[in-house]
From Swiss-Prot:
Full protein name: N5-carboxyaminoimidazole ribonucleotide synthase
Alphabetical list of PANTHER family matching this protein: PHOSPHORIBOSYLAMINOIMIDAZOLE CARBOXYLASE (PTHR11609:SF5), PURINE BIOSYNTHESIS PROTEIN 6/7, PUR6/7 (PTHR11609)
Quaternary organization: Homodimer.
Keywords in alphabetical order: ATP-binding, Ligase, Nucleotide-binding, Purine biosynthesis
Gene name of the encoded protein: purK
PROSITE patterns: ATP_GRASP
Lineage top rank: taxon: Bacteria
Amino acid sequence: MHVLVLGAGQLARMMSLAGAPLNIQISAYDVTTGDVVHPLTLHLLGHGLEQAIEYVDVITAEFEHIPHDVLAICQASGKFLPSSEAIKAGGDRRLEKALLDHAGVRNANYYVIETREDFNKAIEHVGIPMVLKSALGGYDGKGQWRLKDAAQIETLWQEMAACIAATPTQAIVAEEFVPFQREVSLIGARGKEGQIEVYPLAENIHVNGVLSLSTAIDSPDLQEQAKHMFTAVAETLNYVGVLALEFFDVDGQLLVNEIAPRVHNSGHWTQQGAETCQFENHLRAVCGLPLGSTKLVRETSMINILGEDTLPASVMAMDGCHIHWYGKEKRAGRKMGHINVCGDYSGELQRRLCALANVLDEKAFPAVHEFAKKWQA
């Protein structure tokens, strides 16, 4: 089988690594340059998108922000999975909210803002405090504002109006502020015949809006809620592939915050922690193969490496530590790689995270240090 991935970043790279044992070949389309490249070396493959579409068996995507003309060409080929509808819902908060409502899953009360009058209505409908998010283009905490009191209204409106004016069809989605206890996510896969397999929930810790630490957890009640909502969304979309749902945990009740119609950062722990990783299961699904087991095989946490292109050599010598570099040029705040940390039981994982905190820079890895301080207190 030959799969073309729209996007040539780390997710396409890790799909390629996961596909090799199954004899699934991966090419990647760089939407920025328009080049078709090898996902590991990024070497040009010498042909364009239309040629690639002709010779591959399946087309999929590693991210949501794909030009609609590219999506249309791929969808028309009959080879694209999941559907362009799913990708668009992941890249436009208005469509995402409509999907969640249609699927009947809990999500924060919201109002769409395109004008100042809409903003006034949103304040009446949603109330203060509220969270305001750009409908298009926002990720990792970007394109977001918090309205905490009425004194901010004019200033925030000026910023949001500039955001709306800068991009055609842009809007702002106002959401009620949700006083959640923690953020969790569920990664799951749905096959062509409707088979669904979900991984254990992961608890996520963000720093400045960017995922820093993600740990697989055992929470039967939350797991049941999350699987029910995953199934509702996946079946509403007739989804094929891996899908991620991010939730707020509010006193034991889950609300969907976002969906990601693709393999997801909070599922990287599955590379060492699950029977079958999310990348392999995505390829299995879109290629029409049976889904692999999502069973937890060891306690695992994933630590994002942000803006750093080296680690202390001692990390490689630590038991249970697995480093995954993405081959990117160093840039402040950029996702350069991740570390999966494993233990045979919870206490062993916690001790290994604390050992890592002793050698990793606190400024670069604040979530690991915060975890260690709490665990050792």
